[in-house]
Curated annotation (Swiss-Prot):
This is Nephrocystin-3. TPR repeats lie at residues 443-476, 916-949, 958-991, 1000-1033, 1066-1099, 1108-1141, 1150-1183, 1192-1225, 1234-1267. Transmembrane segments: none annotated. GO terms for biological process: cilium assembly; convergent extension; convergent extension involved in gastrulation; determination of left/right symmetry; kidney development; negative regulation of canonical Wnt signaling pathway; regulation of Wnt signaling pathway, planar cell polarity pathway; Wnt signaling pathway. Disulfide bonds: none annotated. Keywords: Cell projection, Cilium, Coiled coil, Repeat, TPR repeat, Wnt signaling pathway. One of its GO terms (cellular component) is ciliary inversin compartment. The keyword Coiled coil applies. It comes from the Eukaryota. Gene3D superfamilies: P-loop containing nucleotide triphosphate hydrolases, Tetratricopeptide repeat domain.
Amino acid sequence: MGTASSLVNAGEVIEDTYGGGGGEDCVIPVEVKPKARLLRSSFRRGPRVIGASFKSTASVDLEYAAEYERLKKEYEIFRVSKNNEVASMQKKEIKLDEENKRLRAELQALQKTYQKILREKESAVEAKYQAMERAATFEHDRDKVKRQFKIFRETKEKEIQDLLRAKRDLEAKLQRLQAQGIQVFDPGESDSDDNGTEVTVPSTQCEYWTSGALGSDPSMGSMMQLQQSFRGPEFAHSSIDVEGPFANVNRDDWDAAVASLLQVTPLFSQSLWSNTVRCYLMSTAETQAEVEIFLRDYSPKLQRMCETSGYFFQMVFFPEECESQHFAVRKWEIEKSSIVILFICSSLPSCLQEDCEEAFLKNNEAKPRLIYHSIEDGRSDSDGLKQLLEQDTNKANKTKVVDHCGDPVEGAYKLYCHLEQVIKQDLLGIEISDPDAKDESATMEDDDYGDVLWDVHDEQEQMEAYQQASQSICELGFQKYYDRLNDLVAAPAPIPPLLISGGPGSGKSLLLSKWIQLQQKHSPNTLMLYHFVGRPLSSSSEPSLIIKRLTLKLMQHSWSVSSLSMDPGKFLEEFPHWLEKLSIRYQGNIIIIIDSIDHIQQSEKHMKWLIDPLPVNVRVIVSVNVETCPQAWRLWPTLHLDPLNSKDVKALINMECGGANILLTKEQERKLERHCRSATTCNALYVTLITKLLTWAGSTGKIEDVLQQCLQCQDTVSLYRLVLRSVQEVMPSAKEKEFMREILCFISVSHNGVSECELMELCPGLTWEVLTSLIYHLYTLVLLKYTCGLLQFQHLQAWDAVNLEYMQGGQNIISEYREKIIKHFTTQLSHDRVTWRSADELTWLFQQQGEKQKLHKCLMNLFVSQNLYKRGHFAELLSYWQLVGKDKISMASEYFDALKQYEKNCEGEEKMTSLADLYETLGRFLKDLGLLSQAVTPLQRSLEIRETALDPDHPSVAQSLHQLAGVYMQSKKFGNAEQLYKQALEISENAYGSEHLRVARELDALAVLYQKQNKFEQAEQLRKKSLKIRQKSARRKGSMYGFALLRRRALQLEELTLGKDTSDNARTLNELGVLYYLQNNLETAETFLKRSLEMRERVLGADHPDCAQSINNLAALYNEKKQYDKAEELYERALDIRRRALSPDHPSLAYTVKHLAVLYKRKGKLDKAVPLYELAVDIRQKSFGPKHPSVATALVNLAVLYCQMKKQDDALPLYERAMKIYEDSLGRMHPRVGETLKNLAVLRYEEGDYEKAAELYKRAMEIKETETSVLGAKAPSGHSSSGGDTYSVQNTLPVSVFPE
């Protein structure tokens, strides 16, 4: 027996089985054993029954034994599993602790590494900044050293030139002393070598320049010195230094002629050089029907015809009731007009007599005139009309009378046909005799300019700006400025640009233009490159167009045709290289003048080349306003224009008032003098404007009132505002005053101005009477001017005054007027009228308005983009696309899509030809963007269209082949390019002949291609062939500016010489003869040269040297026409005059001797040629000294003549002497030495000395190989034996001669 505690093991749990669900498990501690008494008492349930058995008492516990055992086992299992889990968790805890410690250690290591890397990064960044600072310092030092070296080089070159010039002077003096019989010790006879001067001169051949190689040229160093060290005929690089069809013209003659023609063109009357065809129409009441039909039906046709050629067409007329009014305005209009038309019946009304007298009888410039004479049955002409017709037609043959009797419609058509012919022939210069003239004209335009894209209007604008700037006759106090400018030209190089500064209106433009005139007059060999910058944001202030124009101006003095990159950034890179190249070859000074350079956007950025030292013979002059001059330029030498002093103010006032027959009182003069003493009132523009205003008011008798108002104006802008108010007061009605405001506002908000015909459309209700009267007043008061047919403000102060007076509404009013201009040009586009005006104005206005979607739509007009691109406005076109937010690929894609859409509607040859042009333009545009792979597709499509729509052998197919080959060449696909170039060459030769400029262009392209493939010999041969073609054609690419405009006005030039006989008129006739001669128009040239000769003989006498000039040119013309007998007679006559009139060493005498000698040789009169060749040697020895290369050249030519006469013994010493001169002066490895060696080899070969001949020929070939290997693409010409002065032996060794 035992107690209940014996049933419970230590630590076991006894569950409460009695209960009501709220019991808890109890753990009975077994360490404390319960007392027996307590245990016994716990089982008592009342009175104890004695005698009860133990079994009966414990039977209840035994019933749960099995359950107990099961629970015990489960518990044991549970306990063991939990113990295992606890043990496992403990192990995991230990493991996690270890992992945690490891990760913490790694984290600490990473943090240390990060800190180390961070410190290294900071150290590297610091090192980077230090390296950049060192690099910047090094670059600065390098540029400084480079500039110093260039200055040193240029200085030394100048010193060498001075020494060589002094040497030549001493040699010439020595020759004169020896000629006088004075014995002088000749250092050249000494055995000492101390006197030898070895000089190396580059070849005188015209190099072939490519834009891509510009930056890789070596330093000009000795080239500058040596190019100018020898001044002989073959070393004198003329602007037209050529052989060929006009090689016989005295080089001085055509140099002077061309220079004079190109310089005098801008100084003609405005109607001769304007790009506006202005017709002044007069009519009577009887012919009103014809006038109305003509204006309605035919005036628009003439307008479209002129627009196609880039001209404005304006038909100006006054109503009949106004004929007796506004005589000054009508007279001004007649003077401006390029043609006058008179509709008349049988009588001349009195109201038209003044106009007819002004237009027909005072037509000093012999401008075209048309008279439509309506004849009616039974009515005879009045005496006044008969007198007009007889006087005018007898005086000058420029008036055409169109007689008509019958239907007014037929009469109007008849007049239209005559007027169209006059405009085309006399004003536009279009030949209409050939039915295919239009196509040929377009072709010839392309021939003239090649791949160079330029805008004729940009050049026209500069010519007019120069002409207008030089119109003033006031040069008060300019002489001191002229002297300073002359000192700049004469100062030793190198020197920085000269800065001309002054306040607004101080006369900077006038000073520069007047000085340019003086330089052109007194220094014809000086090349003047000028640019007058207009108002800010105009085309003339666009930096890319300025640099491009100056680059093209430099290129025009080279025979080579280089493809000029359209990338604006490359202009800046290539311009200094072109400047340096030309400075080496040009014999005179090169002066670059940029007026108002501070108006250029970001002028310091785009004119960086001004900072670098300039070549020796280059001078740069720029003008700026004092307030806006960049700080970096203020260190340059500065010529500041001082304000006018009292004396100058008084002289200017008297000059202006005297010219207008206005007399001021002494009191009025004193008031003006006292007023014009402040800084803002004593400048030239202010004084000029105030006197103009007083003279203008003098006609109304309100001088005193206007003077009082002027005295209240303290600056030029306020004075211009007074001008505006004064003109507005004379307008008779409020409507006309509103027209004035609108016109000035339109001009103010436009890009480059507005034309009169555009104003007539922009201002409904505006009449020619009102418009011309208003413009006359504003032009007289120096507020408006004409530029390229557009009305612009003469000065920035006038623009400011208009803005202050009429544009007070700010941006709103500006936008309002711009929208009207946009609407006008948009309407033109909707009618398929795309002109240079709509392309320029619309795109710029959209840009200024910020209307990107409209700008994008405008750019997607294929003809607008084509117009901009083909006129060379590539930079603007690119900037517009950038504003729209399109990159190059997007541009290409959108143009492709637009072209495909346009192609769907193309039918007919004309449309397909236009489509081909668009595809070609797109291909060239993409090529200029650098998208060569994308450019191939449109060029191929252009080629396909032209081959299909026209003919596989059409010249335009050659154009497509040429452009496509250019892309392949840039892509280095030389095989494809060569094949296409050869196809283009074949087509061009078949279409134009072998001596056309198109052929020369293909030869040039092939030469560049061979050069890139290192095929220098083939490239050189093609260059020579191309050069001869270009020399024969005489329409050099570089003359595109002068000659392109000059050819259009040649007839007006001719008319200027119809007056009385003068030496100036005779000179002009000679120059016109040279001009036509240069164009191979020999018949016309002969006429002018004969007229020049006859006039000179009458005015100057038959033995005057000027007569010899005309005779010499006539002889050259007959020589070209192969009329050798006439040429020989004239050459002999010219030689006789020049021998008697000129010094023995005069260049003109030398030229005549040369040409006559060549003619004698050509005719086989070798005995007559010998003394002339000997005389040529003698002249050159006297002119240049016995050791000059020119003397060697003359000796070679004389030796060749002796060989031709089989006098080898006489030729041998001449060859040896020539070779000695060449070796001493040019170096033993110079090409001239090699050519002389070849000639000596021929001579030895003919004498039978084959061993010596082989030795000489081997040495000549070594020189040739050395020359090719060293110079590569610039290998000088070997001077082949072809040409006028050539003798060749028909054997293995050709004899070569050198041009004289």
